[in-house]
């Protein structure tokens, strides 16, 4: 389909800033709806190698399948079927939760090189002339009946709405705040401007295959202030990350930056840390193909939009990689925004592109997505601190509750995944498993109560632990 054909079918024009997973997925969604759009990417290429990888869970997989893309991704990595967990006292346990998730939903959990994800999204995109690289955005101008985005080379792109899919260092977020401060002082709160904080850093790496790390399995190795998580391909790569607690908490944008030397230094400091019985961090580093180190911002904004500007993905909610939901949450954002834009595009030109219509749409977008994104963010935050044994409570929960809470963890995972958002105007695949029908997207998620429910489970275990220690002391 040519660009002209898209324009004939929809007068609505969307400017997407950021050739990210969120941005390119939104472009695919809009192409399916014949909504005119353009993608502006500041880098010279869409898919650079940065050493990072992405976990795709059933909630993200279902959206990619709606777009006809999932088979391309599934072929890149064997599904995860077994999780192995290791604690510093030598205790280990295994869980087939990933296999059960696949059986219930019809989609496995897979981990893929982020470069490959972006490459596939771009190569399968039908209107490549709509994706422009070397387009660093300098400012956004509100035009009353539209909006204009000006890039570093002096080009101006006009549309009805600007979507900031440009990540944690979002230029569009900065412009949204600037314009709101100029026109409606106080609308953007100081809390939102300081919403992103950093307490952890992470070394992401991709290594050559190590024989003792079996394909289709992944390992979580926990310690105090540190965790290492690996995913193992078949005759291929090992994806891994080392997450470490930093000495002090900082607030974005005054957060640390790290070099390749920093990544090497961290991995050298933890070289003897055991990932498994036979593999240490030094083995992952010695066999690495690429690696990078980054600060891990965490936070979620209370205001996602202003006027004709809206944020999605990491530009509005940022989480650690511990529960693998960052990219999946961005995919859900894209699916909901595209569904609302599709509905809007069916109105008359005047009604569909008016300031009132845009404000109503963006209000609905945030109200639809906020609670679920906030719950996912909070669960990720809790997961990072559970995995790094951040305090006594989380240490005890991780060691004495988590290994024995399999059915409850499964139940909560199923409910969370089954209530995920999707593209409303595209059909589902026949491969959908039975779990999707067990809950509707209108069912309230319970993710936000994770710490309280875990504490309730912990108390009996804690009393038993103390009783055992007391008996041991008395008998000695």
From Swiss-Prot:
Gene Ontology molecular-function annotations: FAD binding; monooxygenase activity
One term under GO cellular component: membrane
Keywords: FAD, Flavoprotein, Glycoprotein, Membrane, Monooxygenase, Oxidoreductase, Transmembrane, Transmembrane helix
Cell location: Membrane
Transmembrane segments: 447-467
GO biological process: terpenoid biosynthetic process
Highest taxon of the lineage: Eukaryota
Enzyme class name: oxidoreductase
Residues modified by glycosylation: 343, 471
Family label: Belongs to the paxM FAD-dependent monooxygenase family.
PANTHER family assigned to the protein according to its UniProt record, in alphabetical order: FAD-BINDING DOMAIN-CONTAINING PROTEIN-RELATED, FAD-DEPENDENT MONOOXYGENASE ASQG-RELATED
Protein name: FAD-dependent monooxygenase prhF
Organism placement in taxonomy: Eukaryota, Fungi, Dikarya, Ascomycota, Pezizomycotina
